[in-house]
Amino acid sequence: MIDRMSRQIFTLLGAILAFSPLAAQEQPEWQSQYAIGLNKLQPHTYVWPYATVTDVEQGDYEQSPYYLSLNGKWKFHWVKNPDKRPKEFYKPSFYTGGWADILVPGNWERQGYGTAIYVNESYEFDDKMFKFKKTPPLVPYEDNEVGSYRRTFKVPASWKDRRVVLCCEGVISFYYVWVNGKFIGYNQGSKTPAEWDITDKLEDGENMIALEVYRWSAGSYLECQDMWRLSGIERDVYLYSTPHRYIADYKVTSSLEKTNYKDGLFGLDVTIEGASQNASSIAYTLKDAEGRTVSAEEIPVKSRGLSNFISFPGKRLPAVQAWSAEHPNLYTLFLELKDATGKVTEVTGCRVGFRTSEIKDGRFCINGVPILV
């Protein structure tokens, strides 16, 4: 009797599990509104790794010895839906000899694959043509085109023993990434850059990167704009290198005091990441268009831990050259990370303008002056 009851209980449990969501085939990440990214670095301002302060002044980050563009010709394979994609194409041993070349950045519809669609306010896939009715977060499966991208690259010798980051500036609309056959992560969001630390995935000599790109994803429901609906890698792909203790992020505040709109109010916050055996410091210099230093300071990074937030004391700078549309005056900010001996280990920076915007007496003002909008 007990054995028969036990068998009935197990049979019932099996039936329940068979129809439970856990037993059902899981939806892929590109069909989920929660899978917006995996293993990505935190968003931050652009921290271009220049070699010298002179390079910062010139502002041409693409000429930095610590920047490597992956734009250009990639091997490419296009299919009508996910079931037809080459599932193991990311493996270095996979043969791509019969694949075509495609230019990156560039949408695949503009290079002979699929069809570009223009709509203004509706979802392009919510149409009889695709036999699909909008059901967020799901998108069509049978017509969800997939592009498989591959290319090789070599890391400069000067990057040895440094950190290496991969950045994809914009890929429509969902993609997985592999380096040397090793899974890196994924991203969902066509117009947002995504970065991954790939230092431990690199090899000496030639390396291989692979992207599997899906035309539509759950994120496509948030990208319904008055525009052409296109697919693929449409913005820059590149690598950059930093020391293992590096400037991860910084924030500049630069406005005018509102009494006479003459003096500048300057603030700077910097985030340093990466463990260090030794002490270090972070220094900034702010120079005007003639190269004169208007402010400078250096603060020790007391902690040797993984993350340090440094807030420089705010400063009031007398009689700055304000930024406006008529007179777009700019200053140059230099940031230098130093080791315990005072040696500069990383240099970055940006242009800075002093400007204040406000509603004053019912009018929109820039630097205290009303403008027409």
Regions found by a protein language model. Give the residues of each.
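Accessory beta-strand-rich segments of carbohydrate-active enzymes
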Residues: E29, D60-Y61, H77-V79, N107, ...
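Short glycine/proline/serine/threonine-rich loop/turn segments at secondary-structure transition edges
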Residues: W159-R163, L202-E206, R316-L330
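Beta-strand-rich binding/interaction modules
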Residues: V177-V179, K262-K302, N308-I310
